[in-house]
């Protein structure tokens, strides 16, 4: 018999009477976000909902495609949309360095700049700054122990260009060298929020310190105190910037000549999510969840590094404390088994680079596990990658053709594999969402993972 786990702070009505929570602060232009719970998962913390943003709805739980530099690598926006993606996440660190947040601002914000017409998010840039590693001589990855598949040894939110560089942590912020030209930069919570407001996403994140799981308890405690102070400062700067009720005339010519509706969309106030840290320590994780939930954030992110076998426990520690009326994002996690775990424990949003990164390197998701398309056995396999898959790749090309492209080092290879992988993960989450609505989540989970993990 499954034990029933409930969150604190609020009790929802029975199924059939969804709760809608609109978020609006004094001085802000309009409701910036609305989160409606459609149905809760019996016996666990999971739920299906709808997150409304100024640029469209996100049906949660949902997978967020990572467009690090305002692009999903090897795909155009139409291909991303056709894969079922509803929301894209850009990286503040990379867009600040290139092309520069003011250029993105002058181009109409990240959505218009990259021609993505749906909801957008930006992270704070903190993970990339701290994952440079030199600040404490250790690398950071999202999961500290993974399977033996070599393709998974790449940290999930660690861009290829994030080679170790100099980074120095202070109480007020972090200084680091640009990986592009060696120039020195200093990021504070206020600076991160200013950059993200320029980038113009619908949902942004507070600046936090992402620690290495190998750090001792004393340092984890110090870093957590810093993260909480930075959260308060991020929130204060966000409120200051979002309090303006007039369109900023300092913006570039493309926005000054925009229609009123375009200006309204571009200047809509973003929702700000606070990030829970605390490493692998239960006391620190719970302490952080209490501290961050006491602040006036619109939603929450769970950050930091996890041991794969401990991830479910750590997520549950946090979610049993956070208020359930606000959306929750698990940062940098996106493997199929982890998606089921997160959703069961109340996570609404996930982001991860793996679908496209693995695709570009010839590793492809299927319901029976990953395949390496360049293996010899696929050279004469004229079946689609997945027989019942409705993605563009599977409807038009064979395994043999995709394998041929990879062996020939053709650019189309990574595109076709990425289309399939993104479709696979996005639609897996959509099917999980539907299983919550249909009251068969646990049956669907057991059936899928039995085939995928072969247990």
Where are each of the predicted segments found?
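C-terminal extensions of enzymes
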Residues: 31-50, 58-67, 71-74, 208-214, ...
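Glycine-rich phosphate/ribose-binding loops and adjacent secondary-structure elements
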Residues: 225-228, 237, 241, 271-385
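Non-catalytic, usually N-terminal nucleic-acid engagement modules in DNA/RNA processing proteins
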Residues: 31-242, 376-379
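Alpha-helical packing segments of well-folded alpha/beta enzyme cores
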Residues: 192, 223, 227-230, 234, ...
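Intrinsic disorder/low-complexity segments
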Residues: 1-30, 239-269
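Short, well-ordered coil/turn segments that N-cap beta-strands
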Residues: 85-86, 116-120, 200-202, 268-272, ...
């Amino acid at each position: 018999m499954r034990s029933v786990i409930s969150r604190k702070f609020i009790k929802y009505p029975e199924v059939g009477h969804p709760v809608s929570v609109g978020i609006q602060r004094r001085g802000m232009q309009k409701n910036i976000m609305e989160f409606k719970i459609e149905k809760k998962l019996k016996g666990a913390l999971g739920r299906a909902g709808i997150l409304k943003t100024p640029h469209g709805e996100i049906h949660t739980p949902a997978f967020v495609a990572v467009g690090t530099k305002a692009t999903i690598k090897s795909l155009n926006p139409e291909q991303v949309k056709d894969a079922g993606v509803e929301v894209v996440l850009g990286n503040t660190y990379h867009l600040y360095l290139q092309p520069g947040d003011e250029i993105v601002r002058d181009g109409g914000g990240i959505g218009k700049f990259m021609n993505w017409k749906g909801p957008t998010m930006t992270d704070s840039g903190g993970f990339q700054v701290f994952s440079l590693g030199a600040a404490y001589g250790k690398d950071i990855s999202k999961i500290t122990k993974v399977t033996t598949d070599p393709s998974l040894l790449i940290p999930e939110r660690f861009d290829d260009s994030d080679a170790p560089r100099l980074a120095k942590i202070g109480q007020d912020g972090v200084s680091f060298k640009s990986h592009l030209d060696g120039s020195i930069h200093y990021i504070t919570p206020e600076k991160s929020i200013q950059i993200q407001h320029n980038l113009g996403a619908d949902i942004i994140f507070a600046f936090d310190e992402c620690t290495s799981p190998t750090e001792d308890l004393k340092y984890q405690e110090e870093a957590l105190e810093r993260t909480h102070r930075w959260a308060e400062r991020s929130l204060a700067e966000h409120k200051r910037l979002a309090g303006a009720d007039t369109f900023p005339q300092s913006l570039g010519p493309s926005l000054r000549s925009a229609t009123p509706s375009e200006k309204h969309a571009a200047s809509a106030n973003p929702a700000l999510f606070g990030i829970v840290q605390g490493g692998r320590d239960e006391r620190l994780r719970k302490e952080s969840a209490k501290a961050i939930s006491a602040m006036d954030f619109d939603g929450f992110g769970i950050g930091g590094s996890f041991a794969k076998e401990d991830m479910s426990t750590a997520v549950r520690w946090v979610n049993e404390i956070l208020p359930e009326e606000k959306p929750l994002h698990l940062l940098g996690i996106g493997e199929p088994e982890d998606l089921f775990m997160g959703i069961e424990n109340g996570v609404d949003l996930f982001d991860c680079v793996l679908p496209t990164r693995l695709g570009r390197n010839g590793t492809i998701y299927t319901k029976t596990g990953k395949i390496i398309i360049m293996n010899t056995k696929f050279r004469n396999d004229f079946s689609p990658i997945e027989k019942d898959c409705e993605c563009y790749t599977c409807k038009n090309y064979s395994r043999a053709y995709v394998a041929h492209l990879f062996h020939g080092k053709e650019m189309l290879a990574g595109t076709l594999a990425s289309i399939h992988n993104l479709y696979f993960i996005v639609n897996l989450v959509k099917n999980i969402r539907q299983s919550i609505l249909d009251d068969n989540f646990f049956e669907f989970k057991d059936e899928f993972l039995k085939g995928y993990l072969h247990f």
